[in-house]
């Protein structure tokens, strides 16, 4: 017996429903994530958050190996037999168990790296999460392969709520950073229970004779790319933790969660829509690049507008969401929002890499961009936590032109100047909006923090409204409206 991906009959309808479920689930996860940042910041100190960030910035690398790319391998396989699925389950479970042991044994070394004894015991308890996640991997992949996006969305939302609930209860007992480990384990355990119950299958004993070499090779290629990305995403935390201690790292980590992680989650559903559409348009030349251009502009008038507001209103936003003891995180939040602007606008390049299937050049570009990021962070760290944030803001501003140049070397007909001007234009508009937000926040300061945030948000929208006087901005908005109409029409046609 074998498991095949859903056939073409009704696939469009299921894809549309799945996209809606995924988007709804993503929206709820973002809300829960923000609520978690706000609530736990009120219950725990910057040092507590810094200690947990020390654990995860190093131990978290095990999560890359835990999956080993085998979940994606199982999802994309044309045919997956029941025995292959069971064998993959046991492989992922064994990897999870091995990594849990490895992280446990590494705990004293991680603590020594940071000079914080408590990190060792925190790491030892957190290691259990890698075992739980390893066991859950193929159950989750099975739901994904079967296009059961509602089940996945429910799992993610419920697990996040369970984790937050456990974390809050433990935090109220006054145990500090242990509450964050409890939140991690609560979410991991809830995920395992839910995906195992919803997947509707149980693994059989492992047996040889079923070919899985192709899955391993696919997985290794995924791991290589994810490793590079992981290093780039965590070098800042390691540098701050080692050089400046848990208090500074805790401040930085909360700002990172608010700016970078939220922007990443906002981009994810857009990427999930853009990549398959661009894959269908590969042979249509001009239409393909028109969609890339308009998609880039669309990001500039949605996610980047929010980031522009955060850049200008970082001080009142930090005070409102995190509280007064986190005031030192405000300039970091502003700088990380700048980094998120350039990362968001460069997302269109990532769509091209994936939709065109040029993952080799993508891996090599990632090596270059991560090297730039590491260099900027190390140089910036000479001026403390704020210097690291400056380095992280500069790095994507230096990397995006390289990405466009890289693509133009691999693919012919790339409208490099048009795409580059789009990024520059959207970045300038973000600066314009941020300036309005900052000025409005200053003027509203006597009225309190909430009034500052509201005034800054309104001022950001006013700034973009004024910018609409420019013909190029009006053309941008017209293009975005046209694409949205086409997508709605396409969705309606596929749902019939």
Protein language model annotation of sequence segments:
Residues 1-34, 67, 72-75, 79-90, ...:
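N-terminal membrane topogenesis motif
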Residues 2-11, 15, 150, 193-238, ...:
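Interhelical loop/hinge segments that connect adjacent transmembrane helices in multipass membrane
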Residues 2-5, 9, 405, 419, ...:
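Membrane-proximal transmembrane or re-entrant/amphipathic helices at the cytosolic face
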Residues 18-33, 180-183, 187, 191, ...:
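Transmembrane helical elements of multi-pass membrane transporters/channels
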Residues 76-92, 251-367:
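Specific pore-lining/lateral-gate transmembrane helices of multi-pass inner-membrane transport
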């Amino acid at each position: 017996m074998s498991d095949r991906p859903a056939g073409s009959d009704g696939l469009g309808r299921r894809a549309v429903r799945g996209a809606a479920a995924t988007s709804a689930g993503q929206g709820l996860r973002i809300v829960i994530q923000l609520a978690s940042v706000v609530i736990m910041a009120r219950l725990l100190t910057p040092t507590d958050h810094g200690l947990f960030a020390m654990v995860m910035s190093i131990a978290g690398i095990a999560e890359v190996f835990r999956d080993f790319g085998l979940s994606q391998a199982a999802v994309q396989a044309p045919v997956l037999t029941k025995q292959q699925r069971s064998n993959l389950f046991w492989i992922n479970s064994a990897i999870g168990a091995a990594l849990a042991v490895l992280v446990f044994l590494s705990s004293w070394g991680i603590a020594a790296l940071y000079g914080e004894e408590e990190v060792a015991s925190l790491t030892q308890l957190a290691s259990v999460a890698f075992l739980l996640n390893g066991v859950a991997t193929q159950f989750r992949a099975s739901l994904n392969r079967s296009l059961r996006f509602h089940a996945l969305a429910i799992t993610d939302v419920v697990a996040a709520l369970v984790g937050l609930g456990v974390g809050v209860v433990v935090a109220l007992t006054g145990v500090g950073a242990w509450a964050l480990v409890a939140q991690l384990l609560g979410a991991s355990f809830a995920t395992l229970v839910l995906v195992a119950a919803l997947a509707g299958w149980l693994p059989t004993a492992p047996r040889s004779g079923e070919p899985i070499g192709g899955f391993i090779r696919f997985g290794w290629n995924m791991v290589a790319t994810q490793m590079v990305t992981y290093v780039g995403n965590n070098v800042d935390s390691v540098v701050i933790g080692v050089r400046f201690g848990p208090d500074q790292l805790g401040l930085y980590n909360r700002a990172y969660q608010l700016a970078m992680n939220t922007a990443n989650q906002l981009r994810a559903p857009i990427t999930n829509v853009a990549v398959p559409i661009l894959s269908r348009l590969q042979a249509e030349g001009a239409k393909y690049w028109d969609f890339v251009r308009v998609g880039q502009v669309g990001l500039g008038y949605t996610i980047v507008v929010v980031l522009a507001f955060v850049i200008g209103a970082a001080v009142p936003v930090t005070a409102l969401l995190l509280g007064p003891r986190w005031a030192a995180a405000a300039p970091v939040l502003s700088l990380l929002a700048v980094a998120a602007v350039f990362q968001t606008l460069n997302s269109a390049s990532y769509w091209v890499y994936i939709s065109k299937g040029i993952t080799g050049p993508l891996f090599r570009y990632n090596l270059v961009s991560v090297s730039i990021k590491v260099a900027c962070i190390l140089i910036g760290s000479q001026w403390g936590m704020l210097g690291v944030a400056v380095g992280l803001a500069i790095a994507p501003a230096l990397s995006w032109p390289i990405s466009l140049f890289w693509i133009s070397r691999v693919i012919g007909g790339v409208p490099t100047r048009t795409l580059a001007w789009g990024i520059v234009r959207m970045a300038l508009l973000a600066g314009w909006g941020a300036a309005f937000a900052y000025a409005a926040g200053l003027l509203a300061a006597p009225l309190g923090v909430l009034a500052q945030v509201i005034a800054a948000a309104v001022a950001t929208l006013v700034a973009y409204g004024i910018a609409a006087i420019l013909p190029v901005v009006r053309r941008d908005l017209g293009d975005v409206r046209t694409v949205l109409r086409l997508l709605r029409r396409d969705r309606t046609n596929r749902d019939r």
